[in-house]
């Protein structure tokens, strides 16, 4: 029995498997969201010392996505396996660390839940195959990029560029849109925000967008084609503006405070994938 036949014969089992996979991936995404910016900062500092001719200093302890093992953010005690079960551990421990009782951020279960639900949604919309695999990759990366940009105002090249190339590779087989539309979409996506960036900078002397935003929209264009770009930007702008105004009103923040645009591009990208399979704007 192949995977498509299994999914059609046992749909509940298949969807449950995707939900559990999404929760597990979400747990890993939490590691990426927290550690990747720190890893990049360490790398940038080392490169800066080298280019400035400064001493290298003491060798840094290994720090990557696999090491050291997950630990309590308060007392730094290594987490037990049963304390690291996606979503369930946080609920069971009522948002507290088992080792010291410190509060554990709601961000961790939220990321796991978003990842799990997005995988479940993908299973409802796509049959097992290349399109489903692409959708799962996109949803996972969108969740990670949105969270990283919201925390650090950074969209790492190590995520946006593989997302861009992945869109072109998947569309070699016209998985989401024809390859010609994907290539034009990648170029147009980058250039559109690049032009807006420079126009605003010349008129106001300030920067309204980051270069990571250019690359993320280029990646969305590579997955969904150039025809989707106006709607992607419109959705990202409207949702971002609405959420920003509400957030600033609630927390009484200054309108001059810079805010991330990447999370809203990620939201629009996820909506674009869904509308694409439902016969939306890309056709």
Curated annotation (Swiss-Prot):
Its EC number is 3.4.23.43, 2.1.1.-. It comes from the Bacteria. It is found in: Cell inner membrane. GO terms for cellular component: plasma membrane. Gene3D superfamilies: 1.20.120.1220. Keywords: Cell inner membrane, Cell membrane, Hydrolase, Membrane, Methyltransferase, Multifunctional enzyme, Protease, S-adenosyl-L-methionine, Transferase, Transmembrane, Transmembrane helix. One of its GO terms (molecular function) is aspartic-type endopeptidase activity. InterPro entries: Peptidase_A24A_bac, Prepilin_IV_endopep_pep, Prepilin_pept_A24_N, Prepilin_peptidase/N-MTase. The chain crosses the membrane at residues 13-33, 106-126, 128-148, 153-173, 176-196, 216-236, 259-279. It catalyses: Typically cleaves a -Gly-|-Phe- bond to release an N-terminal, basic peptide of 5-8 residues from type IV prepilin, and then N-methylates the new N-terminal amino group, the methyl donor being S-adenosyl-L-methionine. Its main location: membrane. GO terms for biological process: methylation; signal peptide processing. Pfam families: A24_N_bact, Peptidase_A24. It is a multi-pass membrane protein. Plays a role in type II pseudopili formation by proteolytically removing the leader sequence from substrate proteins and subsequently monomethylating the alpha-amino group of the newly exposed N-terminal phenylalanine. Substrates include proteins required for biogenesis of the type II general secretory apparatus. PANTHER family: PREPILIN LEADER PEPTIDASE_N-METHYLTRANSFERASE-RELATED, TYPE 4 PREPILIN-LIKE PROTEINS LEADER PEPTIDE-PROCESSING ENZYME. Belongs to the peptidase A24 family. This is Prepilin leader peptidase/N-methyltransferase.
């Amino acid at each position: 029995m192949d995977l498509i036949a299994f999914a059609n014969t046992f749909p509940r089992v298949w969807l449950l498997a995707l939900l559990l996979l999404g929760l597990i991936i979400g747990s890993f995404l939490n590691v990426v969201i927290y550690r990747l910016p720190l890893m990049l900062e360490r790398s940038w500092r080392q490169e800066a010392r080298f280019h400035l001719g400064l001493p290298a200093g003491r060798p840094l302890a290994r720090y990557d996505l696999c090491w050291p093992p997950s630990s309590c953010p308060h007392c730094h005690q290594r987490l037990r396996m049963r304390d690291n079960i996606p979503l369930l551990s946080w609920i069971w421990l009522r948002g507290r660390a088992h080792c010291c009782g410190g509060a554990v951020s709601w961000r961790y279960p939220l990321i796991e839940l978003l990842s799990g639900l997005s995988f479940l949604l993908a299973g409802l919309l796509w049959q097992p195959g290349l399109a489903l695999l692409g959708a799962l990759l996109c949803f996972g990366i969108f969740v990670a990029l949105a969270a990283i940009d919201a925390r650090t105002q950074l969209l790492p090249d190590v995520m946006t560029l593989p997302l861009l190339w992945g869109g072109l590779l998947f569309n070699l087989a016209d998985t989401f849109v024809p390859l010609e539309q994907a290539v034009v979409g990648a170029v147009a996506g980058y250039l559109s925000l690049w032009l807006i960036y420079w126009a605003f900078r010349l008129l106001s002397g300030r920067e309204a967008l980051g270069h990571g935003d250019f690359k993320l929209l280029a990646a969305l264009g590579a997955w969904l084609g150039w025809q989707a770009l106006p709607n992607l930007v419109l959705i990202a702008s409207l949702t971002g503006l609405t959420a920003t105004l509400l957030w600033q009103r609630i927390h009484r923040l200054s309108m001059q405070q810079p805010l991330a645009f990447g999370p809203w591009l990620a939201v629009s990208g996820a909506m674009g994938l869904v509308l694409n399979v439902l016969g939306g704007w890309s056709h």
